[in-house]
Amino acid sequence: VADIVKAGRVALDGIVLKKSDQKVEADQVTLDGQPLEAPHGLLAMLHKPLGYVCTHSDGEGPTIYELLPPQWMNRKPSVTSIGRLDKDTSGLLLITDLGPLVHRYTSPRAEVKKIYEVTVDHALEDSLIETFASGEVMLRGEDRPCLPAKLDITGSHTASLTLMEGRYHQVRRMFASQGWHVEKLHRRQFGDYQLGTLEVGRWQMLDTPEV
C-alpha cells in the first residue's frame, strides 16, 4: 500500500496523498482515478496478467485479489470473479460482490459472448472455421457438443475465437480436440465489456447493472 501511495496513485477529493498512514474515509479516496467504495454493489473490470490465479488462496502463485484494493476483501459479501481464467491465460475478468450478477453471467443457460485471442503451435487450417461453427465439436469426457463458435483466422498461427458458453478450459480443449495445442490465450471481451486500453494488472470501476 505504501508503494502505491508513494507512486502518486492515491488521491483524496482529487488531491494526491503523500503519506500512507493518513486516515481518510474510503468513499472519498480514489486509486488511479477510480473510487474505492461502492455502497450499493461493486462491479469492476480487471486486466488479468499471466501467472495469476483466480482463487482467494492458492499455492500455485499470486492471486488476482492482490491486484485489487485491500478493503474490497472486507466487503460483505466478499468480492469474487465472474468466472475464471486459468493461470496461463490473460485478459478481461469481471469482479463483483453481487451474487445475482454472478448467477446471471455464469448460469448454464446464460449465453454470454466471450472473445479470445489464440496462438497455436502449428499452422491453422481454414477447415477449422467450419468445424467450430458446426456445433458438433465434442470435448473429452462430455456428453454434449459445444455450441457453434466463430473462428476468425488472423495469421498462420493466430486466431480470434468467439464463444457463447463457458466450459472448463473450453478454448484449449476445443483446439486440442482437432489436433492443435494452444500456446497463448487472451480474453479481450466478456459480454458487452471490452478491455480496450486498460493496462495489464489494472482495474476499472464499471456501472452496476440492475440485478
Describe each PLM feature range.
Residues 1, 13, 94, 118:
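Residue-level signal for inorganic ion chemistry
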Residues 2-59, 206:
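S4-like RNA-binding module at protein N-termini
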Residues 15-20, 134, 140-211:
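RNA substrate-recognition surfaces in RNA-acting enzymes
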Residues 52-55, 101-104, 126-129, 196-197:
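Switch/connector loops and helix/strand junctions flanking conserved nucleotide-binding motifs
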Residues 98, 123, 164-168:
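Helix N-cap motif at beta-to-alpha junctions
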Residues 103-128:
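N-terminal accessory regions of nucleic-acid-interacting proteins
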